[in-house]
């Protein structure tokens, strides 16, 4: 019983931490827009391009700080698949299928609007991402109107989404390769895997080799953030009956240590550095540009159609089940929130395009699509509870008891 309460408390802490980080990210994005369109704009854009150790500040943020973000994402992915909500097919079916729909449909919408231009078609993956921090931040504003099972569904779907985004970045957004650096990175990876096989539990050796891996990957032409994911995959989970306490696990220790830094420093800094969009000289015609339309419509329409459509089909076919204590309307509302692409969408946009004008179109599309998804999704979810039918004790008592018991079991995992 005590262990169950502890696990529920940890889950609640995780959700609350993600929500708080999402709210801070929103604030930083708004602040960046304000600064970029104020008398401070010149200093803001100049500071981002101040050179330091061979790279400007913006590159250090996008290639360096974001490697820490991807390390954290990789740790989450590994933990969830080995020892979390995604460790069994029964739990992973719905978020995995929904995530697949949420990648395919937005990508197709973007591609259909940019099919005539090979240059802009490179951005097809921009609307395929979901920002877990931003989405959980919006959910936190709704309080108890959204059942815990749907919050878990959104969090696990976003983790699968991140895994797909990592694969997309590695496969489709890799520059010309430096073979020597790539071989060096492979050698360092083998050393890290050796640490894992030898059950090395101290984090220091992994982190030292991780820095070397990051530098070699940066030189190789593969985006440097991939080093964070590779490092995460080698950190041992070591969950065993002999050492069941999370404190004995290097993966849990590192994830717990990184969590506040990622939520309250890394992601907000990225948002502040990359969301700054100057509207000076911009006309309403930018909203009709294929890149802007592809990103905005992909996030807003593509995500909700893909996520909800795939989830509906999976549930109707009996492959998955509707989250406990959730209604179809609530599932649709959460599907809308999946259109909040922000962090990962902006990041992929920077990889897809070097042209400043195209990057600005990406930012406009991400802002329009993400804000529309957030506002309409939150509005729908705030109304759905009132629309639910009244409980009939003679009819629903047993079903409700079973649902609550199932929810407790899911939370305890």
Swiss-Prot record:
GO terms for molecular function: sodium:proton antiporter activity. The chain crosses the membrane at residues 15-35, 57-77, 93-113, 123-143, 152-172, 175-195, 211-231, 261-281, 295-315, 333-353, 364-384. It catalyses: Na(+)(in) + 2 H(+)(out) = Na(+)(out) + 2 H(+)(in). GO terms for biological process: regulation of pH. One of its GO terms (cellular component) is plasma membrane. It comes from the Bacteria. It is a multi-pass membrane protein. It is found in: Cell inner membrane. Belongs to the NhaA Na(+)/H(+) (TC 2.A.33) antiporter family. This is Na(+)/H(+) antiporter NhaA. The gene is nhaA.
